[in-house]
Amino acid sequence: MTPVSSDYRPNHIFLPKFRPDKITSECNTPQQQNVIAEGLYNVSEPFPIRNTDEERYLDTKEIHHTWDNTIKNVVRSIVSIKGSALRSFDTESAGSFCATGFVVNKTLGLILSNRHVVSPGPISARASFINYEEIDIYPIYRDPVHDFGFFRYDPSSIRFHDVTEISLSPESAKVGIDIRIIGNDAGEKLSILSSTLARLDRPAPNYGIDNYNDFNTFYYQAASGTSGGSSGSPVLDISGAAVALNSGGSNSSASSFYLPLDRVVRALRCIENNTPITRGTLLTEFLHWSYDELSRIGLPREFEYDCRTRVPSSTGLLVVSRVLRNSEVSKALEPGDILIAFKTDSHKSTYIVDFVSLFEVLDEMVGKTIELHVYRPKRGFLTFQLTVQDLHNVTPSRFLEVGGAVLHDLSYQLARSYQFSLNSGTYVASSGMLNWSSGTRDFLVTRLANKPTPTLDAFIDVLVQLTDNARVPMHFRVLGKYEEEFTIVTVDRHFFLASIFSRNDEKGTWDRQSLPPPQPSISRRPSVIPRPQEGSKSMEAIQNALVLVHCRMPYSINGFSSTKLYSGTGVIVSVVPPLIVVDRSVIPVDICDIRLTFQSMSAMGHLTFLDNRIAVVSCDYLPSNSVQLNFVADFLRTGDECTLAALDEDLQLLTKKTTVRSVSVVETERSSPPRFRYVNCEVISLMDSLASTGGLVFREVGDDREIVALWISVVHQDVGGKDYTTKYGLSMSYILPVLERLKLPPSARAQHVPTTAGVEWSHITLAGASTLGLSQTRSSEFYMKSRENGTIPRPLYVISHLRPLLHKTSLGVGDILLEVNGKMITRLSDLHEFETESEIKAVILRDGIEMEITIPLYPEYPTFSSRAICWMGAIIHPTHSSVFEQVEPDVDLPGPEGVYVGSILYGSPALNMLRAAHWIVAVDGHDINTFDDFYHMLLEKPTDTFVQVKQMNRRGATSIVSVRPDPLFWPTCIIERDSNGRWCTKHLQRKTKEVCS
């Protein structure tokens, strides 16, 4: 089948100019008959023609004039729709879209569009008329199968536009009629495409197995070349009536596909009469086969003759294509059965020749029994008594949101696509906590905590019995795979609000019901498998000291655009209190969940300390076989022998004796968007490494093992934006001072905050320094000093300013550092003894001249945020230090920290309005200087009106946007620690106290 795509997403394409086809003037042609039928000419008058030597052409001037009048009238009914799918649901993903609709009843305010526009899930949409007047529209009906649905608007809200309505005329659709498709094609507000209706019996287009697909209906086809944004456009004849609804198009040709309006008219009449729109189904997909195809599978020729005699226009019959697994009908019908007729209590035997004749009866017989007659090849004519199911009951209308995941009952759409039976499991539309990656979807949860979850209600019953952070087994099945899979998930009830949403079609909105709070957590110390101990000198002691650390970020913040699982190896550095040190790449941000996996147990971790190099994690308890290793604050030298001990993902200890290749300053490129990176850090490279998650480096001194470095991962970003990882050793000289500082009371820790000069250092060779003016005497001094230290003689020089907006420094790019407070500096570690000073006296080489300057030192600026606010779907937090590395020097940032947009969630009001990696500098004309200013502003801000936001990028360019809050689906929340140090999401309510979820 030719691949096709929905006209749902805008994509710009080139549209060739329209050239009207030549119309012959033969008096008996269909074209002339159509023109006469439309009343353009009096039959008694001569038919106007233009004579030439070879041909005669119909004068189309008056036809164009009529199309002009038609278009002038109908464009007042057509609206451009812009909206957002607020949550992933069924076959639809969260995100913004544009489409088309048209008014079919201006008194009730009804707009017709496609089902994939109206959407089965929650959406927020606005419609714009031709005069750019905008109104709110609310979805009130979407067909469970066919690609149409209705919006409703308030007619009294239209102030300046004279709305007309377009009548629906399915009977006017005929092969060969001229049509116009008017809509928001390619997002261009109003496009008019011309074509000729070519086919009325095309199979429903196939948009792909994971997407919404229509079935059990014919489609119309014409070469109109519609594209994204034209979904929901009316297919108009010359009288201005809609003969079909534009739905999709081909990727490889100009073919467009239109939905017939037979069932649309019925649904519209039900809405107008305020009666339920019943939809019946046999949970079976039918296809229309021609009589020749039917004869090849055994349909008797005499029966074909009878069918053609009864219905001369018939070209074939309906055939069973597939039946939903484990349904009642699956026990009766089989693929290949040919539908002949049916009989009901209120109908005589009626022959089935097309989809309309079938569903005219099924839609009226919901919950009742029909007698279906079929012809089965090799078996002959058979009769079955079948109960008509309610199609609405197999289409989900509610969902659960918990831990960032969206779950609902398995729909008929997906069950049909993958040949699953209904109630096979709870469908995951967005995974959240269930897979630690909110983008993953398309799997069924079949069991949770060892209990079956065939439906959403069963899943909720299990979930409410679980505690926050509980670790439970989950069985699931990925759609498209043949086997069930198994994993262990962590329940998250603290980072996200947990609610059940139910669709309310009367209001066109959704009702929200909060889930009961989780069961209280009970901390139990797990039993540990006893293992023989040989003291701290044994390799087993080292293995027991290594811990796998897993970190999950619930939101993309601080420049980290992925919420994937971060993992690495940490080292137990203190038994009492329990402390584990891990490198910063494993725990990139403060707002996260941490899980520690020891050799025989696992536990939740609590972040105690985070700086530019390491993270210190605590936990409630350690395994009883944990011991204190011997850590030494000493720098290795090039050529030193050492041993690398590391863990693989299976907690197996790997060791390798090796030699130090080099000791150098790590250099990393600035990333986009700005995020933490290792700077001003001296690292150790080894001759031989191991494929591992991390570990430690030790050296043997007699019978003792001295731990001298942590084996870490340094993540770089190349010019193409791709991350790659390099392993280095980080000296314990960076780690042990942090541990000593953590032993101090909180009040004393503030007096021992490390300071920085606000520049990035790197090495330069002596040859390069000599070119810049370094004297021979200085070169000799560097050479001799480096020999003493066992390093390569390379002075430090400034390669960039890290925070020019915050730290005014007397150092310039290219300055070579020679001395600090009278001490020669030959390596970066020589600066450690000055990191608590407020200023230093330095001798530098600048422009070939040695000079003495005073360098002010500043407290290190945080590289992470310890709290954040979710506002209209934007994750907002104080600016982290990496942003200031990539700011124009003359940018005037309000306030000392600024309010920074870390990320935008899909489907939120902020999507396509606010920009990630921008500052919010004003809201409704009020300047925002600090995070606290922003927080207090939100407590006073109403949530039912548009908000004007002024934002600024790192180049200082500003823009103003208007965003409308959505307190139902996107309430304002603050993410911070509670009094016990645990993460908690608090719902901010205007002029009321916070309520912790």
UniProtKB/Swiss-Prot annotation:
InterPro entries hit by this protein: PDZ-like_dom, PDZ_sf, Peptidase_S1_PA
| Domain spans labelled Peptidase S1 | 78-268
Q: Which residues form a coiled coil?
A: none
Q: Name one GO molecular function term.
A: serine-type endopeptidase activity
Q: What are the residue boundaries of the PDZ domain, all occurrences included?
A: 870-955
Keywords (alphabetical) are: Cytoplasm
Q: Name one GO cellular component term.
A: cytosol
Mark the transmembrane ranges. Answer: none
BP terms from Gene Ontology: proteolysis involved in protein catabolic process
Subcellular location(s) per record: Cytoplasm
Q: Where is this region: Disordered?
A: 507-534
Q: What is this protein called?
A: PDZ domain-containing protein C1685.05
Organism of origin is Schizosaccharomyces pombe (strain 972 / ATCC 24843) (Fission yeast)
